Amino acid sequence: MQDFLQLTLSGGQPEQKEGRNGLLRWRWLNVGILELTPLHSVPRALVVSSGIHGNETAPVEIVEQLVNALLRGELALQARLLVIYGNPAALRLNRRYVHGDMNRMFGGRWQQYEDCPEARRAWILEQAMDNFWQAGDYEEVRWHLDLHTAIRGSYHAQFGVLPQRMTPWPEDFMHWLASAGLEALVFHRATGGTFTNYSSRHFQAASCTLELGTALPFGHNDLTQFAAVRLALRQLIAGGENIPAAAQPRRYRVSQQITRRSDRFVLHMSDEVLNFTAFPQGTLLAEDGEDRVYVQQAREYVLFPNPNVATGLRAGLMLVEDNVHNKAL
């Protein structure tokens, strides 16, 4: 087929909507949504998404290389694969989003937004994921990797955020995340509106949001910084063994959320504060009218601080180290 990324950015449709090479069949399902299926039976179904935020281009470029290699027959495919470029309209504009943050709209939350292109797109992506996994065998292993970059710099340059899960995480999934070069893993303890929360909660997929560096425009990313995750993705898609991790990721869990509830909200952090900056117990983190948010534990670490979110949305997460796991590293 034509270049999938360029086709997505143009908003066009391919002349042929399905085809095959010697290793796989492909189907163009919608703008930015491509299904690739091996010509033989496989036990795994994998969703790889990127571009949910339109200014986070490095993951899109990483996925583009994989898709091109698959379509040219240069890379074997050992999983059913659904590739998603999440927000084509925002990607064209190099903006985080056009009207609203799509990664707060999944799990049906898109119904709360009227006349919002991101809400309509979230519904389309939910349907595509539903159809993809329903088409597979009930026993197949389901993984969802949602690739992002962070707005701010970070003490952990690359890290993963895992949604709430009621059952233990599969060991092979944890090993893969380590082999991808992630320096830290953050575990949510509550449900939310992210794409990975949707895939985990509704389809019992092993899901992770991978935060890979900082947001830059197309053509300005140094993809050599992501050598570990690029190799890990190739190995996963081609059915190879995990590359041994250089080090095990540090583990954190969410201790509290900072939410902007009114126009009087003030976040007591500078724009230069990095993700995973530590604050001691008793530190005033935010004010919102008469409400105050303080560090509750002996030490908490901030993640995704953003005072400019819309009212009602998350303005930051506070984390504590998961010492039970970290002592075993």
UniProtKB/Swiss-Prot annotation:
Annotated transmembrane regions: none
Record-listed Zn(2+) binding positions: H53, E56, H148
CDD domains on file: M14_ASTE
Pathways involved: Amino-acid degradation; L-arginine degradation via AST pathway; L-glutamate and succinate from L-arginine: step 5/5
Entry's cofactor comment: Binds 1 zinc ion per subunit.
GO molecular function annotations of the record: hydrolase activity, acting on ester bonds; succinylglutamate desuccinylase activity; zinc ion binding
Location of the active site: E211
InterPro entries: AspA/AstE_fam, AstE_AspA_cat, Aste_AspA_hybrid_dom, SuccinylGlu_desuccinylase
Enzyme class: hydrolase
Superkingdom as given in the UniProt entry: Bacteria
Pfam families noted in UniProt: AstE_AspA_cat, AstE_AspA_hybrid
EC number per UniProt: 3.5.1.96
Keyword Zinc: yes
The keyword Zinc is assigned to this record: yes
Cofactor(s) demanded: Zn(2+)
Keyword field: Arginine metabolism, Hydrolase, Metal-binding, Zinc
Catalytic activity from the UniProt record: N-succinyl-L-glutamate + H2O = L-glutamate + succinate
Disulfide-bond pairs as recorded: none
Family label: Belongs to the AspA/AstE family. Succinylglutamate desuccinylase subfamily.
Entry protein name: Succinylglutamate desuccinylase
Gene transcribed to yield this protein: astE
